[in-house]
Design a protein with these regions (language model features):
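A glycine-rich, hydrophobic loop/mini-helix early in the fold
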Residues: 91-121
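Generic hydrophobic, aliphatic-rich segments that mediate packing or membrane embedding
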Residues: 85, 102-106, 128, 162
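Polar/acidic, low-complexity leader/linker segments enriched in S/T/G and N/D
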Residues: 2-98
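Surface-exposed intrinsically disordered loops and tails
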Residues: 21, 41, 46, 114-117, ...
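Residue microenvironments linked to proteolytic maturation
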Residues: 12-13, 117-228
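Intrinsically disordered, low-complexity N-terminal regions enriched in serine/proline/glycine
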Residues: 8, 27, 49, 80, ...
Length: 228
């Protein structure tokens, strides 16, 4: 478990999985899924390797607070994104239930999923995705791989219903303070003084607080330094 890997804290990010739909299943869906994902899918001949299901998904959105009240900035995202490669894909955080592996990692635009290069994101202050591509081994769980394929079909009850989630381990963080509903940290006030961070940590959701300061502004945890 990640909690044993010498990090003090963990946070969870999640995102809908987008599969590459085989053309023999539905050629229109196959075309739509290719347009969305082409830049991130591993290069695999799925006709020859019909037991492999290529997938892609956003591991997290950089520079935007997640629902747990945590955020990763551009610098940390760029330092860690390649670490996802060759990691397992699990079902529901069950480490013994590995159904595939991650093979590619890159960046895409927030809201549109258009591929971005390292150069394009390096100086970005606004939100962007860290996007991963990988494979699910259909043979391990046929029912699940069918569900993943159906999740890109708007007429299916499984549409947008399969998510990947990631537990990230870290030991260091600063605080960011935002007003109202704002989730993007480009206009946040950052608190990096260790004494001040410690004084306010009980306000954080990750430590059982309400995520608010006395003046009504919202306080979040910005993950820094090494992330596993």
């Amino acid at each position: 478990n990640i909690k044993n890997m010498k990090t003090k804290y963990t946070t969870i990010f999640s995102s809908h999985i987008k599969p590459l739909v085989p053309e023999d299943k539905d050629k229109y869906l196959a075309l739509a899924s290719m347009v969305d994902l082409e830049g991130f899918l591993p290069k695999i001949d799925t006709e020859e390797n019909y037991d492999l299901l290529p997938i892609a998904f956003n591991a997290f959105v950089a520079n935007r607070v997640n629902k747990n009240g945590d955020v990763v900035d551009t610098e940390t995202a760029m330092a860690m994104y390649k670490n996802f490669i060759n990691k397992p894909v699990n079902i529901e955080h069950n480490r013994k239930s590995v159904i595939g592996t991650i093979l590619t990692a890159g960046f895409s635009s927030f809201g549109e999923d258009k591929p971005l290069t390292e150069e394009e994101v390096r100086d970005m202050k606004g939100p962007f995705n860290v996007t991963l591509g990988g494979l699910v081994w259909k043979i391990i769980d046929k029912e699940l791989s069918d569900k993943i394929e159906n999740s890109s079909d708007p007429t299916s009850e499984d549409y947008m219903n399969v998510s990947a989630s990631w537990e990230l381990g870290f030991s260091d963080y600063n605080l960011v303070v935002l007003e109202g509903e704002e989730k993007n940290i480009e206009n946040a006030t950052e608190i990096s003084d260790p004494k001040e961070v410690e004084r306010l940590q009980d306000k954080l959701r990750g430590f059982g607080g309400e995520g608010k300061l006395e003046d009504g502004t919202f306080v979040y945890r910005k993950v820094i330094n090494k992330v596993i």
